Structure formats: C-alpha cells, structure tokens
Amino acid sequence: MTFPHRHLLGIEALRPEEINTLLDLADKYAALNRQPDKHADALKGLTQINMFFENSTRTQASFEIAGKRLGADVMNMAMQASSVKKGETLIDTALTLNAMHPDLLVVRHPQSGAVDLLAQKVNCAVLNAGDGRHEHPTQALLDALTIRRAKGRLHRLSIAICGDIAHSRVARSNIMLLGKMENRIRLIGPPTLMPSGISEFGVEVFNDMNAGLKDVDVVMMLRLQKERMDGGFIPSEREYYHRFGLDADKLSNAKPDAIIMHPGPMNRGVEIDGTLADDINRSVIQDQVEMGVAVRMAAMDLLSQNLRLTRGAE
C-alpha cells in the first residue's frame, strides 16, 4: 500500500488503509528509536524547515528530532523575529522560501486554513503541525498509534474525549481519525465548550463525566485552551476540575483497563489529577510523546518518497 499524498494537511483526506500504512511504518521507527543507533537515511540530502508561528516546545522538538534521525538538514525559523513580523504576508514568505528549494516545510499557524494556503504556493511537501482550531494531524496519528499499541487494535473501541472540545484542533483530528477506524466516540464537557451541531458527526455528547465515562476503553483529556477563549466559558478552574477534571472517582466509571491520555501540555489539578497522570499502569501520556517522534518520522519518510518520485518524473 502506497501513501499517495503530496502533503499532510489533515486527517480528512486520509483513507483508513493509508492511516494504517503510516502507523505500520511508525511502529518500525518506534523500535528504531529504542536502539543505541537511532538513525536512518530516508531524508538524507533533503532540507526540512520548521516554521512555527505559534509558540511550541514539544511539537517543534519532536519534528526536529524526527528530521535529524532521518538524516535531513533541519532549520528552525524564528518566526517571532521574521519578516512576517515586519509586515510580510504569509504568501510572500512561502514564495521566498520556495525560491530556496526546501524539501519539507513543517508549519504551525494560529489561523485555520493558513497551512493549506501556504501549501498551494510551494513545490515541496508541507506538514501541518497545527492550524488554529482546524486540524493537528500528526497528534491524532500519534494518539492512534499509542492506542493501537496499548489495546492491540484501533477499531471497535469506546473512546471518550473530554474537556475543551470547542477550541481543540486535537479533538477535531481525533474525531475524524477514530471515526474512520469504526470506534465509538464520546465527547464530554460543559455545553459552553461543546461545538454546536457536533452530534451530527456521529459522536455521543455528554455534559456529565460519570455518565460519559461509563465502560469506555480510552479516556483522552484535553487542555483548556484559554488563549483561544474570548469570554467566560467556565465559572472557575476549581469548579471546572470538580465537574470535568479526571480524578479516581470519575475514572472508576471506565473499564478497569482503560488507558488515560493527554496531548499536553497538562494543567494538573484542572483537567486531570496529577496522581492519575503519573499512574504507570493506566497513563500512556509519556508513550504519546514517544510515539510522536516515530509518527513524524513515518510521515516525513512517506512524503519524501512521493517527493522524489515526482521530481524524478519531471
């Protein structure tokens, strides 16, 4: 099975078999990453530019490590000091970079759709590292790989996504991916943080944690995205934790072997009790971080193969 995509802009364009192709390759890279010599040559001779218009620590580091382990020449652009801050448009930036002939662009941007726009203006492969509230495809893919490794499968599971659904690109990408793989998805959160009409996407909506977590296999907690809120979405963090934060009492409604996930960064004592986050028997949060590097290696490997084929045919 090939991966017939020039870019990785979102989950929406991926078919289930393409998702499995990427995850299968990521599994191999996960094994490589545990070896003393973690390097491969899939991106040897290629240039990777990371452009983060939003602050990021873990995602940018993950992409940088992934590129370097595959042999790419990796450049991190300081967008806070770039020409964009001096008035240059995103399109002008894209055209300027395109003239330098990079091979892969990794882009995070605060505006939904900005990465798609940039991809239309360049000749290289583009990976969406998160755009506004729209999508975060590699996060959904690494979550999927984490679930598959922990549960032995990625289908017919009951999965609860809890918290700030309305502002979360992670939730959007996960809903699409997990839905494509025939899972039962439950969304749990206050009405103020639930997108209108979301039940039309084949998910179940709950405003009560105890009811929503009943017999689920996976509990995925989300961060409160305060930077995207422009009003009083919650009474207080203390009240939010009381009603929607994951603690032992609420978790007792899930299956005994249910796993706990969080895309990070975590607000301990707001979305999740710190003891649960560190529970080595239930929490797979650090596994998510580990799988992030493997998934991004797989994504860039597959896109680079198409890039070389395209250039070879020109």
Swiss-Prot record:
GO terms for molecular function: amino acid binding; aspartate carbamoyltransferase activity. Pfam families: OTCace, OTCace_N. Its EC number is 2.1.3.2. It catalyses: carbamoyl phosphate + L-aspartate = N-carbamoyl-L-aspartate + phosphate + H(+). Gene3D superfamilies: Aspartate/ornithine carbamoyltransferase. Keywords: Pyrimidine biosynthesis, Transferase. InterPro entries: Asp/Orn_carbamoyltranf_P-bd, Asp/Orn_carbamoylTrfase, Asp/Orn_carbamoylTrfase_sf, Asp_carbamoyltransf, Asp_carbamoyltransf_Asp/Orn-bd. GO terms for biological process: 'de novo' pyrimidine nucleobase biosynthetic process; 'de novo' UMP biosynthetic process; amino acid metabolic process. GO terms for cellular component: cytosol. Carbamoyl phosphate binds at R58, T59, R108, H136, Q139, G264, P265. PROSITE patterns: CARBAMOYLTRANSFERASE. L-aspartate binds at K86, R169, R223. Pathway: Pyrimidine metabolism; UMP biosynthesis via de novo pathway; (S)-dihydroorotate from bicarbonate: step 2/3. Catalyzes the condensation of carbamoyl phosphate and aspartate to form carbamoyl aspartate and inorganic phosphate, the committed step in the de novo pyrimidine nucleotide biosynthesis pathway. HAMAP family: Asp_carb_tr (MF_00001). Belongs to the aspartate/ornithine carbamoyltransferase superfamily. ATCase family. Heterododecamer (2C3:3R2) of six catalytic PyrB chains organized as two trimers (C3), and six regulatory PyrI chains organized as three dimers (R2). This is Aspartate carbamoyltransferase catalytic subunit. It comes from Roseobacter denitrificans (strain ATCC 33942 / OCh 114) (Erythrobacter sp. (strain OCh 114)).
